């Protein structure tokens, strides 16, 4: 009992010491009142994106919350977020460093690290994400992965039985990222599919855990009393899985080198080759190599897959929209044949059983599908609140002074469901993007905003469009129980995970 009283006394003294030192920090910014020591943390459990949306409606585009002793400002609506992350990019560019994240990889991964290491990793990865290389992958690897998956889906379609597509789509997305990163992929026979499915489940589990606030990140004195073993152990399993992939890559690469396979330039090799070369040159640490590979495969696979799944969910719940998309794709194919000479590739496309419709070839020919994809990005942003930033200096925004050292949250979910910019924001209305005006597109921040936006956005655009166009061209998707709409409420985490729904797929021809 005396121990507990002493503990409470220490926390109370510590709290009032902090209050005395930062009582004027961001004090002019409105926001919900918190409680001593914890601030607003008790109100931030569960679906945090919905709570931040609720506070936005109450306090406006800029409001202040206290996460323990961490001063936090939440920004909502595109003009404000743009002013911060583009107009004042130097002040907002850095990531907020949470101690729990630093424990995972010493803070040396692409997503979290700041400064020179981040610039080095970003330059390295972007050098591999060129439009030319992505276009090459569209016509080779993405095309091949779609055909492999469709052979599996054809078998399910022939049975007429309901199927849950989540793991199939996530495995497809994971294979795309694995090829870019490691130059390898899983096949769909059940032995490897089950192994990949276990990793997918692990990845989703980590994203869900990591999306929730860890109290000791915001009240450091509580660290000895907070159990983070599940969080740390889940990441360790991902780390070990990724380390095995790197070892496999190194072993296979050494075999190729031993048989004088030197015809492949570094530019044609996967990203891991450049990461390992930078490590051997002493430019980055081993933690940076492994953790950056983890960033690429977890974030890259999960975000694209969830967008594809949410889009299919809406097309099933709105069969009239699905019909319009199919008609749009059919017209695009006809127009493509009329506009182009019938070269060898085109002849192959006409005669092959499985047709893939690439982003670079069809995106301008299928405008309605493009609007559907944008509406999916709007209604279901993969990162509902983004990853937190921190101000490096005092800065004025919208008439308020935001102090240096303030954690900054991009309120993406509330921005995308903002009635000022999107009428009927909770409805799926692709036609809202029928205008080609730049303002209609610029209100979306699903890939983030500013110099630290999503590094793989070009690959994601290509993968998502190509997969959806090819899926809808080949299959009709329906609800086994049409009287009950499919569940569209996802699970909050670092990414907004699509719920599992049983659906029926039927070949169109």
Swiss-Prot record:
<comment type="similarity">
    <text>Belongs to the cytochrome P450 family.</text>
</comment>
<dbReference type="Pfam" id="PF00067">
    <property type="entry name" value="p450"/>
</dbReference>
<dbReference type="GO" id="GO:0020037">
    <property type="term" value="F:heme binding"/>
</dbReference>
<keyword id="KW-0503">Monooxygenase</keyword>
<keyword id="KW-0560">Oxidoreductase</keyword>
<keyword id="KW-0812">Transmembrane</keyword>
<dbReference type="GO" id="GO:0016020">
    <property type="term" value="C:membrane"/>
</dbReference>
<dbReference type="GO" id="GO:0005506">
    <property type="term" value="F:iron ion binding"/>
</dbReference>
<keyword id="KW-0408">Iron</keyword>
<keyword id="KW-0479">Metal-binding</keyword>
<dbReference type="InterPro" id="IPR036396">
    <property type="entry name" value="Cyt_P450_sf"/>
</dbReference>
<dbReference type="GO" id="GO:0004497">
    <property type="term" value="F:monooxygenase activity"/>
</dbReference>
<keyword id="KW-1133">Transmembrane helix</keyword>
<protein>
    <recommendedName>
        <fullName>Probable cytochrome P450 513A1</fullName>
        <ecNumber>1.14.-.-</ecNumber>
    </recommendedName>
</protein>
<feature type="transmembrane region" description="Helical">
    <location>
        <begin position="2"/>
        <end position="19"/>
    </location>
</feature>
<keyword id="KW-0349">Heme</keyword>
<feature type="binding site" description="axial binding residue">
    <location>
        <position position="454"/>
    </location>
    <ligand>
        <name>heme</name>
    </ligand>
</feature>
<dbReference type="InterPro" id="IPR001128">
    <property type="entry name" value="Cyt_P450"/>
</dbReference>
<keyword id="KW-0472">Membrane</keyword>
<dbReference type="InterPro" id="IPR002401">
    <property type="entry name" value="Cyt_P450_E_grp-I"/>
</dbReference>
<dbReference type="InterPro" id="IPR017972">
    <property type="entry name" value="Cyt_P450_CS"/>
</dbReference>
<dbReference type="GO" id="GO:0016705">
    <property type="term" value="F:oxidoreductase activity, acting on paired donors, with incorporation or reduction of molecular oxygen"/>
</dbReference>
